[in-house]
Structure formats: C-alpha cells, structure tokens
C-alpha cells in the first residue's frame, strides 16, 4: 500500500503567519519535533524564513543568510539524530549545504531553484530529495495551470540534469503563492494534471488564506485544521504523495484512512 507522507511544519521564526515565535528557541523546537514524531510524522520541515502572506520575494532581503543559518542550524543539529526524515525549507544553497552536511535529506525550495541556481548541484552532491514549489510575481502570459506545469517541469528537468533522480524531485503547486483565489481553485481542481507528470506531488494548504476563504468565515489559523484535513483527503484522492501540515495527528489519522480506502478500492477493481 502506498503511504501518503505527512510533512510536519516546524517554523523557527518569530513571524510566521500561523505559529511565528512559538518554536523560536531550540528547546521549544525540539519539544515540538518530539511531539510530531509521537503523532506519526514522516518528515519534519524546518523553516527559518517566514513565508507569511506579503513576504514573497522580499524574504531574502529581510532575513540575512547569517540570520537564517543562526535560526535553522542549531535546531537541525538537535533533531537530526531522531529516527525521522528532516527537511529544510530554504531557497539558499548555502543554508541547504550546511544542513545537508548535518544529515538533512530533503530541501524544500519555495522558489524551485529560481532564486539560487546552485541549489540543484548542492542537493545532487548529497543525494538528497528536493521539493520544487511553484511561485512567481503573479503575472503570467498563459493560464495558471499551464504556466505552473511549464515552470515546474522546466525546473525539474534542470534538477535531473544536475543529477537528482526523478523519484527524488517533488512538485508543490504553491497554493497561497502568487495566485488569485480563482487561480487556486483551478489548480486544486486540476491537481491530477500535476500528478500525471509522475513526479511525487506535495500539497501544502495548511491553515492558509485559501482554507479561510474555503470556510467562508473569519477564523484564526489554528481554527482551520479540519478544513485543511478536507484538502488532505481531496489531495490523496487526486493522487498526491505527501501533505505539508501544522496539525500532524489529525492529518496522519486521516491519511491512514484514506490510504486504506484507496487501496481497498484498487484491489476490488482489479480482482481477477
């Protein structure tokens, strides 16, 4: 049975939109990492630069390379010994390499290698996995899904040319980044087209504005977990291979059930 991977979010920033400052100290971050492991997480994604609404392309100007290193490296060094895969959410190859040297095995690049052209070489050198997220400035000359596919496949091709195997390249449609609400609806409705590329797909909707608008009511980020879980179920039915979430326990339980139901359906449709 194919298992949907649960990527738990561990923001070690003072200003992330959902949990900024909550895990800013190493001790707090380690405690949360242990909780996520107990809850069944497959991958812990450590991020040192906020991607809250409005940050987009200015993040690298507001947080220096040195500051990002100071936030991320002590946490990574403290949790990489645990029996769980560690990912680092960064668009800087210097941060990626420093973390890969410590034993990290995945880099989650919100700019898909467009910000730092050396990212693919670094990830390839360490035999790691990479997540390529669709991003941009919101201006496009073709419909959103077509533009997303062209952009992500171009970057995935560069990653493969750098020596990263196909099965270690994840694609993330970038819900919450450089898209209107209608464009996000279009991307969600056509997730199967991204899945059809045969790269593993990671869906990251957790607690985002998209969830708030889907609920059609004012809500704090932590009140959006059940609706986030609905997108997890939907994504699994569409064929995504992983989800990036804040509430690990809820999504782990849901994913286990969805995986069982999908496997059950497959087996019964393929009985000889």
Curated annotation (Swiss-Prot):
Query: What's a BP term from Gene Ontology annotated to this protein?
Result: folic acid biosynthetic process
- Keywords on this record? Folate biosynthesis, Magnesium, Metal-binding, Transferase
Pfam short name (any one): Pterin_bind
GO annotations of cellular component type: cytosol
Q: Which cofactor does it need?
A: Mg(2+)
- The positions annotated for binding Mg(2+) are 11
Name the EC number(s): 2.5.1.15
Q: In which pathway does it act?
A: Cofactor biosynthesis; tetrahydrofolate biosynthesis; 7,8-dihydrofolate from 2-amino-4-hydroxy-6-hydroxymethyl-7,8-dihydropteridine diphosphate and 4-aminobenzoate: step 1/2
Catalysis performed (reactions): (7,8-dihydropterin-6-yl)methyl diphosphate + 4-aminobenzoate = 7,8-dihydropteroate + diphosphate
Protein residues bound to (7,8-dihydropterin-6-yl)methyl diphosphate:
51, 89, 108, 172, 208, 244-246
Which PROSITE patterns is this protein grouped with? DHPS_1 (PS00792), DHPS_2 (PS00793), PTERIN_BINDING (PS50972)
Name the enzyme's class.
transferase
Task: Provide any one GO MF term from the record.
Answer: dihydropteroate synthase activity
Q: Which residues form the Pterin-binding domain?
A: 1-251
The record's listing under InterPro entries reads:
DHP_synth-like (IPR045031), DHP_synth_dom (IPR006390), Dihydropteroate_synth-like_sf (IPR011005), Pterin-binding_dom (IPR000489)
- PANTHER family, per the entry: FOLATE SYNTHESIS PROTEINS (PTHR20941), FOLIC ACID SYNTHESIS PROTEIN FOL1 (PTHR20941:SF1)
Hey, which family's this protein in? Answer: Belongs to the DHPS family.
Question: Subunit structure, per the record?
Answer: Homodimer.
The UniProt function text for this chain reads: Catalyzes the condensation of para-aminobenzoate (pABA) with 6-hydroxymethyl-7,8-dihydropterin diphosphate (DHPt-PP) to form 7,8-dihydropteroate (H2Pte), the immediate precursor of folate derivatives.
Descriptive protein name: Dihydropteroate synthase
Its source organism is Staphylococcus epidermidis (strain ATCC 35984 / DSM 28319 / BCRC 17069 / CCUG 31568 / BM 3577 / RP62A)
């Amino acid at each position: 049975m194919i298992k949907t991977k649960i990527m738990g979010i561990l923001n070690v920033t003072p200003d992330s939109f959902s949990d900024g400052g909550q895990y800013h100290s190493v001790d707090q971050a380690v405690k949360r990492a242990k909780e996520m492991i107990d809850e069944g997480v497959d991958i812990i994604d450590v991020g040192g630069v906020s991607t809250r609404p409005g940050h987009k392309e200015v993040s690298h100007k507001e947080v220096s390379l040195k500051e990002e290193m100071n936030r991320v490296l002590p946490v990574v060094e403290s949790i990489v010994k645990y029996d769980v895969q560690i990912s680092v959410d960064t668009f800087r190859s210097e941060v990626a390499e420093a973390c890969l040297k410590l034993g990290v095995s995945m880099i989650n690049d919100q700019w898909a290698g467009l910000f730092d052209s050396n990212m693919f070489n670094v990830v390839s050198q360490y035999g790691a996995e990479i997540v390529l997220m669709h991003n941009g400035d919101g201006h496009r000359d073709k419909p959103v899904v077509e533009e997303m596919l062209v952009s992500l496949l171009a970057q995935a091709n560069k990653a493969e040319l750098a020596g990263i195997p196909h099965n270690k390249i994840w694609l993330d449609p970038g819900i919450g980044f450089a898209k209107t609400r209608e464009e996000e609806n279009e991307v969600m409705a056509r997730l199967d087209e991204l899945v059809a590329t045969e790269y593993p797909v990671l869906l990251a909707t957790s607690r985002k504005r998209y969830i708030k608008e889907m609920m059609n009511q004012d809500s704090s980020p932590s009140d959006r977990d059940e609706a986030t879980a609905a997108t997890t179920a939907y994504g699994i039915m569409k064929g995504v291979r992983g989800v990036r979430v804040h509430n690990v326990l809820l999504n782990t339980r849901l994913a286990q059930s969805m995986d069982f139901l999908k496997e059950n359906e497959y087996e019964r449709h393929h009985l000889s």
